[in-house]
């Protein structure tokens, strides 16, 4: 009888270690943020604005979600030459929502390129910020831009409504 208990002990220990390892793997998997981008169309003043939103996996209850609007450059698109997607993912991992949009005549926008003006870009950002506030409860908002998008970001306080 003593021999049977001794041969079962290593198996019981191995089963316990396997169960602990499985719990650790499950916990790490559950804690990984599910921050996949979602392609949507946001109603704008001149029609729908193609956009990609990326939200953090979890946000503190009762707190407004911070938002970063990523503005592409001249003749660019919401992918931002491949730099905006990883940036959006990193921001989401740190609890910050992002939205990337295609301005008039760029990316998936169906508007004519002639509508690609700073005033229209600011109006699109207004629509995007308003949509994100109404739909996702976003609060403090920052604009980050590349090239022409950077120019818009620097002039937005004068041009935009938010």
Listing of model-derived features with the role each one plays in the protein:
Residues 2-19:
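N-terminal Sec-pathway targeting helices
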Residues 27-63:
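N-terminal cap/lid segment of alpha/beta-hydrolase-fold proteins
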Residues 63-73:
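Short beta-strand element of the alpha/beta-hydrolase
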Residues 70, 99, 144:
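Conserved Rossmann-like nucleotide-binding pocket used by diverse enzymes
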Residues 76-88, 103:
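The serine-hydrolase catalytic nucleophile loop
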Residues 78-80, 106-138:
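Catalytic nucleophile-loop/oxyanion-hole region of alpha/beta-hydrolase
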Residues 88-108:
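Conserved alpha/beta-hydrolase
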Residues 128-162:
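Primarily recognizes the serine-hydrolase "nucleophile elbow" in alpha/beta-hydrolase
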